[in-house]
Design a protein with these regions (language model features):
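Phosphate-binding and adjacent anionic-ligand microenvironments
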Residues: 288-387
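Gly/Ser/Thr-enriched, mixed-charge loops and adjacent short helices
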Residues: 20, 24, 100-245
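Short glycine-rich phosphate-binding loop at a beta-alpha junction
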Residues: 35-41, 65, 191-194, 291-297, ...
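Short glycine-centered, acidic/aromatic-flanked micro-motifs in structured strand/loop junctions
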Residues: 39-41, 194-196, 264, 347, ...
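Glycine-rich phosphate-binding loop
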Residues: 87-99, 244-268, 314-353
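An N-terminal, well-structured beta->alpha segment
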Residues: 1-63, 85-86, 129, 137, ...
């Protein structure tokens, strides 16, 4: 049995908890040791998933850092600057509230390679077939105690939980927001409408746009584990598009913040359109030296044609951001993504980041004057059974 899919482990939360999948994954990662950072999204059962994961991690990991609720790209950034060996995000991304999952990052916040993920999947299978009962772990209360020099010098606030094995991390969101704002100019007077999907970016995204000078109207901008992604966010962008005014640009996030879809001139601006717009900015900034942009087998043919006009080639991969990231690293280029709005810009982060993508699109508009129109070719998607 394989537990990992296109983006980590994902299933109904009740099934994951009943079968102790988080605990088993924790045991597997614990054998590898090092510093492991854990974050979760807003779903009601994410805290139970976190506790079970930490039960497994305590069987061997030397340092366990717990951040609480945090967007996926923020966890990747914290793992990068803190040089973590692994990071685990508890989330089901854009899926409904009854689902949950586990995304695993490797060294310094990078997505696992396909070979590393396969090895982890195999170890998880073996662990699941030799179960042992998890022991209770308490991670809700923090207390002061001796910390390492590295932790004392960190910009994060780190304290020890009462079991003295788990470190409670505070300030991760602030540090991430500070980092994101440092990468962009001001957008004074630009009108923005946000659909925050009741998810991890519910308060963080409006704050980022406001502090960069934009005029913001935000919807679904409270964190709510029962409502996350329900009739809102990037999976229901058509409804949102109808509410975006002519003088606004709209951005619809998903539950954990690793993807975004835009609304431009009243029409949905998907990942293919965003890649075209961002390639324009990268070309002007001299960042398309390799003349490659990475898409997937689902990327619309129109994008390849548009890129070709500017002497840029489209490379296609299998569906999944891990395949996009692998191609980016192999080709030595910076920009890639999926039609779903999962965009990767390796000069700005190690994984897809909905907030950074949205701000980058505003930078395109600020620099060029408008976002390029993108009218996709008609495409038919269907599966073929091969016997």
């Amino acid at each position: 049995m394989h537990y990992f899919g296109t983006d980590g482990i994902r299933n109904k939360a009740d099934w994951l908890l009943k079968n102790e999948i988080p605990y088993a994954l924790g045991k597997v990662l614990a054998k590898r040791g090092g510093k492991i950072i854990v974050a979760r999204d807003v779903r009601e059962h994410s805290l139970d998933m976190e506790k079970q994961l930490c039960q497994g991690l305590m069987e061997g990991a030397t340092q366990i850092w717990v951040t609480g609720v945090l967007p996926t790209p923020a966890l990747a950034y914290i793992a990068q600057i803190e040089k973590a060996d692994y990071a685990v995000m508890i989330t089901a991304s854009h899926n409904a509230p009854e689902f949950n999952g586990l995304k695993v990052f490797g060294k310094c916040g990078k997505k696992l390679s396909e070979s590393d993920e396969t090895a982890l999947d195999n170890e998880l299978f073996l662990t699941m077939n030799s179960p042992s009962a998890p022991q209770p772990v308490f991670i809700d209360e923090a207390c002061a105690d001796a910390l390492t020099d590295e932790e004392l010098n960190s910009e994060l606030s780190v304290s020890l939980a009462e079991n003295h094995r788990i470190r409670i991390v505070d300030g991760a969101e602030f540090l991430y927001l500070k980092h994101v704002k440092s990468m962009f100019p001001r957008f004074d007077g630009m009108k923005i409408r946000l659909d925050c999907a009741y998810g991890c970016f519910a308060t963080l995204a409006p704050k980022a746009f406001l502090e960069l000078g934009a005029i913001v109207c935000a919807e679904h901008n409270v964190r709510d584990g029962k409502k996350v992604n329900v009739d809102c966010g990037s999976t229901h962008v058509a409804d949102f598009a109808a509410r975006v005014q002519k003088d606004e640009i709209g951005f619809a996030f998903d539950g954990d913040g690793d993807r975004v879809l835009a609304v431009v001139d009243g029409k949905v601006y998907d990942g293919d359109a965003m890649l075209l717009a961002l390639s324009t900015l990268y070309r002007l900034q001299g960042k398309l030296k390799k003349r490659f942009v990475v898409g997937t087998i689902l990327t619309n043919t129109k994008l390849g044609r548009e890129l070709a006009y500017h002497n840029t080639a489209l490379i296609r991969t299998d569906v999944g951001d891990k395949h996009v990231l692998d191609a980016l690293e192999k080709q030595g280029c910076l920009l890639g993504g999926e039609k779903s709005g999962h965009i990767v810009m390796l000069d700005k982060g190690t994984t897809g980041d909905g907030l950074v993508t949205a701000l980058s699109l505003l930078e395109v508009k600020r620099t060029v004057g408008s976002l390029p129109k993108f009218i996709p070719y008609p495409m038919l998607e269907f599966g073929i059974l091969i016997r």
